Amino acid sequence: MTEAYIVEAVRTPVGRRGGGLGAAHPADLGAHVLKELIARSGVDPAAVEDVVFGCLDTVGPQAGDIARTSWLAAGLPEEVPGVTVDRQCGSSQQALHFAAQGVLSGTQDLVVAGGTQNMTQIPIAFASRRAAEPLGLTQGPYAGSEGWRARYGDAPVNQFHGAQLIAEKWDISRRDMEEFALTSHHRAIRAIDEGRFARETVAYGDVTADEGPRRDTTLEKMAGLRPVVEGGTITAACSSQVSDGAAALLIASERAVAEHGLTPRARVHHLSVRGEDPIRMLSAPIPATAYALKKTGLTIDAIDLVEINEAFAPVVLAWLKETGADPERVNVNGGAIALGHPLGATGARLMTTLLHELERTGGRYGLQTMCEGGGQANVTIVERL
């Protein structure tokens, strides 16, 4: 059977909204990690057969197939194509899946996967809610569909509503969420201070480290925040941060490894994606993880490290309750609550961090998953080599 290997992975630091990456064109963010990826791997860029990038809200500077634009903005060969993927927050994890599947199928040998996003310039959901207003289209992507309304009625379709439903279903208190959020900040700060992210990041201008972690946050400060929705328990403190950034990985076949003298760092062990209730939206990592473990014959205890996106604290806390995973193996260097969530780049960022942490700790198996719009979740399991 053909194998798909991760041979290189790199990311920018994650910038806060309006921070050090806020003025950067998203294609330049993508180009930055692509140039670094090629330089670190030493591969001939003309040998790359496709560039698969994740990106959401593809309007303005993020329109026009930003995978292709990023590659060309990096000064790399024009004969290499690119394609942009939108599986909502899982877009660049899906980009990795498509890249690996191309290699596993035997139709491709060397593919780049990644993602880029500038949320400072293009706010979340701008494309679905405001971009079409000049055309007289004021409804979101669901309200105008007769089929959708017949099936789901007029129930709210948004992340905050989904997060609140999860908190209520799994009996997760506001205090639980705030304690989890504080731990995320503490872990991220420790990782930065210990240099754990040094190998996986490439500075962008003066931005040399992730800007999101808050050294001065406390449970008392979190307790003083107002809920996002009146009467709810979800606050900004237990939500992921609006962010900017990019990440990229190089996926290679056994033949490409031999031909280009590459060193495989991890083997793609499993790829899958599952769907669930689109109104609750954010709980799909639970059944998706169960599905992946059943398919592979692995147990959750066999997984050395997990990166599950911290879109909201209850997403991870509910997943922990259902899977029985050891919290000390999950998001060990903090997550999106502290580090930020640059939407279309986050999936690739998570895998980049997971790979480097497996190497640092000597772990064997790593699992990545994340909630996605529409009630979906990708799961990727890799084996460190």
Description of each model-found segment:
Residues 11-12, 23-32, 40, 176-259, ...:
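N-terminal extracellular/periplasmic Venus flytrap/periplasmic-binding protein-like
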Residues 22-111, 116-134, 201-209, 300-322:
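Conserved beta-ketoacyl condensing-enzyme motif
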Residues 86-117, 167-196, 248-255, 342-361, ...:
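Active-site-proximal alpha-helical scaffold in enzymes
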